[in-house]
């Protein structure tokens, strides 16, 4: 079949398709059919060079209301908020807008002086956020007043030499504004009294922020051509997502700890791989039973799904030192249902002996047969072994995800397929495929106009042959039917 299609002239293919399309005029078509058949497909081109929005970092000691303030500024619940110190652990970026201006908002974990263990790593992340920011909101609990930890934050901010706006949070009414005056002693000028929980004073604060921020970021102020392709790293907790992101970025971008579920918010990072910029999203591990998850873990699982929806390609990380679980399969299904391109990354492959590798290959063939079309990369998130193989796999998946088949070629393919493998006769009737068109890409979706319903098995057969013939590797594809009858036919 592939040879016959290759030998077919494009003009001849389009002529055949036009003949088949004309034949549809004898059938009852609705407005949606007509729109689909007459619509012209156009891919979005590159947006050209663009400058990065200015960056505003929010910093303070644990549990002063930083994430609550983030949600208030964004006008929606994005940052994970819980009345427990330390819920935000990484520096997390969000796109924000105020009075017609865009800026990037960075939420950070609580900064603590001389912190130990994971808290020390959280503090380092907060300091890195300050380095990459154009201005900083220093949030202090007005009800508590300045503490020794606040003074430690003050010293760190002074060394950074960044513009700092002092925010006195938890000022719920006018009577409490006097408490904020005591914060003058921290040396950053007049504190802005706000209530992040109720929104009091936040508008005035943002007006001042807009006066402080530059038009474009002066820190990372390079121009990027087009928009970087967006990649979601997903997988069950503690599978190595954060370690992989850090290895790719070449820095400790995400807090890594043996404790499962350390990453709670989606974390975006622009990473240079294969001479191009990619936007990676490292997400919290998807929990086993979302409806049973409590507090921060519940909201983090929702954030993970939201990040997947915003991505273009999902890299599903699977640990080869553990048996493939139902949870792994469910996560894969979630990626497929989202319609994103897909790459499978098998972590810790370098630790396997030959016998275990042979066993795992058989296990993959059995348990992952439904995603045999996805490119596979065997890597080590910890050491970076084979990390260079990710880019070719991502390219293959995204090219397939973007691909569009000319209508003439598609109908020539369908004609060859049906001639060689006609649909089985059911109840004395044999449904025919009248015409086919690709309704969209990202992911590729095809619509077949037919005279009757096609068996599920036959539709799977068409899908499989579409993959083989046109090279749809790394993307889910969808084949839908529109059953139509001839005009004037008695029912």
Curated annotation (Swiss-Prot):
Gene3D superfamilies (alphabetical): 3.30.300.20, P-loop containing nucleotide triphosphate hydrolases (3.40.50.300)
Domain of life assignment: Bacteria
Occurrences of domain KH-like (ranges): 403-485
SUPFAM superfamilies (alphabetical): P-loop containing nucleoside triphosphate hydrolases
GO biological process, one term: ribosome biogenesis
GO molecular function: ATP hydrolysis activity; GTP binding; ribosome binding
Stored Pfam families: KH_dom-like, MMR_HSR1
Sorted UniProt keywords: GTP-binding, Nucleotide-binding, Repeat, Ribosome biogenesis
Domain EngA-type G: 54-217, 229-402
Residues binding GTP 1: 60-67, 107-111, 169-172
Amino acids binding GTP 2: 235-242, 282-286, 347-350
Keyword GTP-binding tagged: yes
Keyword 4Fe-4S set for record: no
InterPro entries: AAA+_ATPase (IPR003593), G_ENGA (IPR031166), GTP-bd (IPR006073), GTPase_Der (IPR016484), KH_dom-like (IPR032859), KH_dom-like_a/b (IPR015946), P-loop_NTPase (IPR027417), Small_GTP-bd (IPR005225)
Recorded family membership: Belongs to the TRAFAC class TrmE-Era-EngA-EngB-Septin-like GTPase superfamily. EngA (Der) GTPase family.
Annotated HAMAP family: GTPase_Der
Subunit-level organization: Associates with the 50S ribosomal subunit.
Role, per record: GTPase that plays an essential role in the late steps of ribosome biogenesis.
Protein name (Swiss-Prot/TrEMBL): GTPase Der
Lineage: Bacteria, Bacillati, Actinomycetota, Actinomycetes, Micrococcales
